Curated annotation (Swiss-Prot):
Signal peptide: none annotated. Residues 1-105 form the Tyrosine-protein phosphatase domain. It comes from Styela plicata. This is Tyrosine-protein phosphatase 12. SUPFAM superfamilies: (Phosphotyrosine protein) phosphatases II (SSF52799). Its EC number is 3.1.3.48. The keyword Transmembrane does not apply. Keywords: Hydrolase, Protein phosphatase. Belongs to the protein-tyrosine phosphatase family. It catalyses: O-phospho-L-tyrosyl-[protein] + H2O = L-tyrosyl-[protein] + phosphate.
């Protein structure tokens, strides 16, 4: 969250799932839909969660303890259909993801 705050990142694209075939593939670094997470000096809350086919778009509001009057919004685009091994069978959803991100940013 520090890098997102310092560089004022507006979008994150995630291509892996947290768990695949019963194995942990990455850490879930974001809070759930109605949760608020504390990460050191940062507080992160999910303010929107929308499913767009095989893509989940989550919006997070980030605040910093030292800057109480400043908040930042970052959008995570989570592509949920990348297989554990190999590549997706078609490219249509990946191009859809690319189109969505480019349209919004």
């Amino acid at each position: 969250w520090r890098m997102i705050w310092e560089k004022r990142v507006e979008a994150i694209v995630m291509l892996t799932n947290v768990d695949e075939n019963g194995r942990r593939k990455c850490e879930k670094y974001w809070p759930g839909d109605t949760e608020r997470g504390s990460h050191g000096e940062f507080e992160v809350s999910c303010i929107d969660n929308t499913t767009l086919g095989q893509i989940i778009r989550r919006k997070f509001k980030i605040s910093h303890q030292s800057y109480p009057n400043r908040t930042q919004v970052v959008v995570q685009y989570h592509y949920t259909a990348w297989p554990d091994h190999g590549v997706p069978q078609t490219t249509s959803e990946l191009f859809n993801l690319r189109r969505i991100v480019r349209t919004e940013f």
